[in-house]
Amino acid sequence: SRVVKDGIVVDFMGAISIVRKLKEELEEKLGIEITEGYTAIPPGVEQGSVKAIVNVVESAGIDVKKVVDEPTAASYVLGISDGVVVDLGGGTTGISILKDGKVVFVADEPTGGTHMTLVLAGSYGVDFETAEDIKTDKKKEKEVFTQITPVLEKMAFIVKKYIKGYKVKDVFLVGGACSFADSEKIFEKELGLNIYKPYMPIYITPIGIALAGMKD
């Protein structure tokens, strides 16, 4: 969405409107009122940005009970205690290094699915929304993958930069930006480590956010 840029809320009222709409749609489907919830942040964001994200959710009528960073949330679903969780999101690449069940390092850089869309917009000479449709069109996946490969290579380089000096063997990819078939092979080539990508990686972090609240 355009209301968030590089993991930071840039359109406060627009973000509230989107969350409120999603809340209403979910309440209608479930037949219940949603009053409490959990939220997540990109790793390493400033405290001011954390407050902004919480304020958006609470302004939409949801009392935030817990905030967790996105890669850590994903680790709850993956059930891992050691390794690197890489969350390839819409605006950022988030990294969490776990050792003996504890997060020992987190980092985040502004490269994600949005940057893939911008590459496609320039390549096809279309606007952002049309490029987004092209990116998610399964019929064009092979063609699109060729063009967004440099973005994935940059993401892999970001991970390599941050995990240098840490003894890790396993890297777990989650997030919508790694949904492309063979995206994990780019990371294997760059990192030379064991790369794992779960089924439907786009849903791993959201489920992890819910599980984070259950750990209290």
Regions found by a protein language model. Name each.
Residues 1-88, 102-216:
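Nucleotide/phosphate-binding catalytic cleft detector across ATP-hydrolyzing
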Residues 93-97:
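Short beta-strand scaffold segments in enzyme catalytic cores
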